[in-house]
Amino acid sequence: MATAEELQKTWELTVQVDQRAGDESMKFKLRVKGNLHIGGLMLKLVEKIIAPQDWSDHALWWEQRNCWLLKTHWTLDKYGVQSDADLRYTPQHKPLCIQLPNMKYIKLTVSYSTVVFRAVAEICRTLNIRRSEELSLLKPTDENSKKKKKKDKNPVLEDIIDMDVVSGGSGGSASPLYSKTMIPTYDPENGMPVSATSMWFGDNPLTSSQPNLPPAELAKMYQPMSMVDKAVINAGWLDSSRSLMEQGIQEEDRLLLRFKYHCFFDLNPKYDAVRITQLYEQARWTILLEEIECTDEEMLMFASLQYHICKLTMSTEPLDFSNEPEIDEVEAALSNLEVTLEGGHADRILEDITDIPQLADSLRLFRPKRLTLRAYKDYWFVFKDTTISYYKNKEVSSGEPIEQFHLRGCEVVPDVNVTDRKFGIKLLLPVADGMNEVYIRCDNENQYAKWKAACILASKGKTMAYSSYRAEVKNIQSFLKMKSMAPPPGQAAPELETMEMNAECFVSPRYSKKHKTKQLTCRILEALHNIARLSLMDAKMRFIQAWQSLPEFGIKYYIVRFRGSKKDELLGISYNRLIRIDISTGSPVTTWRFANMKQWNVNWEIQQVTIDFDQGVSIAFSCASCDCKVVHEYIGGYIFLSTRSKDQNETLDEELFLKLTGGQE
């Protein structure tokens, strides 16, 4: 019997116990002391529960404080738990409904107690997606679709893939989606499976592309119409340094798994079947729902690639890699992708070049001014280092130029229509009070490819002496070839009857309204001539590569208020730069590159982000469309991704990621 003095030191604590499989929860009252550690409390609780079961996955959740009590050696006093605390003894792993980039839903048991960064890594391991640091979880914009009762007659719910059933596992540690008897062995040098995907990857529904929706269904889906709408969507990214439960996510809630950071490292068709397919699907939906802007010509190119991929998907065995290109061709494609993305490989200066190459051509120039028609004038242009100079003609090019453009930190925007033989480059040059526009017009594809590639490198502070220049030129030439509507010489005109699907399925609803079905079919089949020989995986890679070439690729928008300003503006965050954008016109005002960033800080009390760049440039802003933690994490995440290299294995440096992206804690 406890003495009266001992009873005065103890107090009553109520704990609700959640059980699995839909069993009703139980409530228990325990007499405890403040010096009782969490592990001892759980032991007391389990001893009092009559129903025998495995409680190893259970942990204590504190409702009022919205936190897990995971440090079992901490006492109740240290956590601040008192008699009025509302504690739940609940499973740490719970089912979650996840919409994949291909818009399909899966149900998967994930950890609700670990930080989201680690939970996403668990999800990607189960789905066999490498480089989980590139993905994250996003709250759907329609909160009504977040929580659905099981009795709801929702056609989407009936199509959910239960991954615990598919992978033959359940509970805390879901099994990866491959045969347990054929688990791949990973090379410690590069983190790659020793055997090819086709050898160990099972019959995986996630490697096949989804059929395109009928036009009527596509039209019903939500389409962001402005940058402000996109800013609302981007506010929904979960905090990677907090758990699902801490962010209000409950059992069987719905979240979207998406590629958050558009810096795709080491894409390999031999081992990344799921990753490439899901990346293609995310790219495809951004085109169809007009979440990213593209020209009519580009829309047709994407439509022809989708049609080609659909045909190959229906006619090819899911794991037939016999038609895939040999490794040298794959490496070439990957090289192009890495050039576009700065995906972590080291760009080096070519050893055999003693003098930095330069370009010299007769081009046309236009400087937009108010109330003037667009009139291009011929000049002699010289591109040297990271600077463009132009002269009245070639004969006077040894003297002083009319003007020079310094391209470091500029924006390079294509102004191209291959069908109309228009090959233009728009340069947005940073100046003290914003950006100056300059238009340069080239004569042909090859000239355009060389000059645009040089401009892209110069904007990053690199010259044509870097190894990536030649690959960038080839990448641009390949992109132009895909956009060309002209069939190869001697090729007969397409027969409209040969198209087995509705052409309107492959373009955005807005674009389909501009053209009759017959006209659209004809144009897609014409564009198909340039890609008809691509294999399934190569076609997906080309689609991704073309998506990366769009001016708006990878830019996430947020509504912010800059220090000293009295109006809201847009901040665009890309994989290599920050862009200040006029919210009324959508035009870039200033660009700051991550390469020039010295440091950034967050004042959590006033929710303000401050960033210091080279040459004494400093900016500060508060966020209007989201918590500043979302923007802080985006910046830190891209800095983290820039530290990756092929020499490292696939072990994630979680500590470094959380250090760069974490909050006040």
Predicted regions and their residues:
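Intrinsically disordered, Pro/Ser/Thr-rich cytosolic linker and juxtamembrane tail regions that serve as
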Residues: 1-665
